[in-house]
């Protein structure tokens, strides 16, 4: 098992070779890794047509992040496991950000370690914010 791989925020499987924001496409659910959509999981229309939250619902029902990709995704291969902490977004539990109109977020990303945007991990950067 490759513990050094990074998880897809849509399906949770460790398939990415680089930390969040490198636009890798998940071979399991076909989600394109997008830093803005990880930070703002209710926001559609960046690299993916649907929001991360909607993509997670789609994956649960259709096996792919977007309905238009039905038939193009695949199941996890042997050795591809989910991140041990991963779970779908829970609005009652997760303190996720909503983008504000007119705010430039380009300089406010945690560029050194973007894994702090994983809302499901104890290291989530907004874990203590309320």
Regions found by a protein language model. Give the residues of each.
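Short linker/helix segments within small regulatory modules
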Residues: 17-24
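Long, contiguous alpha-helical scaffold regions
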Residues: 61-130
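Cys/His-rich microdomains that often coordinate metals
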Residues: 15-16, 30-33
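Short cysteine-rich clusters marking metal-coordination/redox-active sites
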Residues: 8-11, 26-29
């Amino acid at each position: 098992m490759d513990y050094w791989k990074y998880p897809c925020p849509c399906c949770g499987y460790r398939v990415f070779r680089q930390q969040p924001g490198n636009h890798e496409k998940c071979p399991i659910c076909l989600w394109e890794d997008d830093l803005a959509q990880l930070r703002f999981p209710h926001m559609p229309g960046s690299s993916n047509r649907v929001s991360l939250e909607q993509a997670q619902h789609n994956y649960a029902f259709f096996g792919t992040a977007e309905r238009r990709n039905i038939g193009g995704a695949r199941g996890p291969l042997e050795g591809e496991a989910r991140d041990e902490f991963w779970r779908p977004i829970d609005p009652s539990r997760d303190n996720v950000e909503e983008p504000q109109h007119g705010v430039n977020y380009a300089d406010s990303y945690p560029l050194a370690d973007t894994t702090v945007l994983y809302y499901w991990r104890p290291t989530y950067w907004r874990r203590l914010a309320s």
